[in-house]
Amino acid sequence: MKKKVLVGMSGGVDSSVAAYLLKEQGYEVIGVTMQIWQDDEEFIEKEGGCCSLSAVADARRVANKIGIPFYVMNFKDAFKRNVIDYFVDEYMEGRTPNPCIACNKFIKFSSFLDKAMAIGIDYVATGHYAIIEKHNDRYIIKKSEDDKKDQTYALYNLTQFQLERTLMPCGQYKKSKIREIAKEIGLRVHNKKDSEEICFIPDNDHGRYIKNRFPNKVREGNFVDKQGNILGTHKGIVYYTIGQRKGLGIAFGKPMYVVDINPFRNEVVLGDLEDLLNTKLIAKDTNYIPFDTLKEPMEVEAKIRYSQTPSKAIITPIEDGRVRVNFHEKQRAITKGQSVVFYKDDLLIGGGIIEK
């Protein structure tokens, strides 16, 4: 009897080819687009985003083309609670969240998987560029064949339970090959542009998004230097992130960067590039893939943002499941709320959320 797999289809080329590859491998494939948009007007406005009307139409067209059933499943309440509300709360607290990591943790590999299992489906699948393998009795995640498209940074939260029930067929291919396969089988999405924006903020203006929803919470405040001297007025702390130089709306005669955000005083602290360089951080909410807990210091390569090349570091377990990370070289703009992710060569070790 064929194993059943529910494929999360965004209307993009990766998830489309993932569905095709799994069907070719002999699975009984069902395509699903997750409804996460919060109202109909928003849905129509997001033309081109991964949760827009055109995205659903693209996914449905692909499903018809490759001969699989297709459904839209409603995840909007879970998405609002676990991704949008978290996103807004983090910015209000002066931190910079990563909504894709939250979505993977709480929606794609939790709510979506739960729904799949509830209806008797064996696996869920996505178009992520990562490789899941079983070594002895443990599932591991390795970097994808395509270094430039590798998405393991956003997958460090996956549990053994989730990995056992998850398929990522695109991880074995380069992006160019995925596009080639899509073209060969006649998918119109073969040359569709990759989505790079936050899916629920297609114009990428997160400050305006939060201000529109919570106008009373976003207040002007002071830009200050490290000594607390007032330098000017900011639009609201949600508009800024650590390391930001452009868009401050004020000229200082020299480059100035956001080096800290104080939500209690509603202040944005500005400083020099040197003030952004650091070798240490502490991360919370950690998860490890090849083992359950980190018991002793470990040499790894670590990165503090998605697009960064990993740097050598030592990770040391501390209280409450936290981890101390000491980099060999100074890192620029270590940002609270973002994730730090650990590797050994191409093996994903784990990660956590930067606390300080």
Swiss-Prot record:
UniProt main location, coarse: cytoplasm
Enzyme Commission number: 2.8.1.13
Alphabetical UniProt keywords: ATP-binding, Cytoplasm, Disulfide bond, Nucleotide-binding, RNA-binding, Transferase, tRNA processing, tRNA-binding
Keyword RNA-binding: yes
GO molecular function: ATP binding; tRNA binding; tRNA-uridine 2-sulfurtransferase activity
Subcellular location: Cytoplasm
Cited Gene3D superfamilies: Adenine nucleotide alpha hydrolases-like domains, HUPs, Translation factors
Any GO CC annotation of this UniProt entry: cytoplasm
Reaction(s) catalysed by this chain's protein: S-sulfanyl-L-cysteinyl-[protein] + uridine(34) in tRNA + AH2 + ATP = 2-thiouridine(34) in tRNA + L-cysteinyl-[protein] + A + AMP + diphosphate + H(+)
List of residues binding ATP: G8, M9, S10, G11, G12, V13, D14, S15, M34, G127
Keyword Transcription: no
Family affiliation: Belongs to the MnmA/TRMU family.
Function: Catalyzes the 2-thiolation of uridine at the wobble position (U34) of tRNA, leading to the formation of s(2)U34.
Protein name per UniProt: tRNA-specific 2-thiouridylase MnmA 1
Gene this protein is translated from: mnmA1
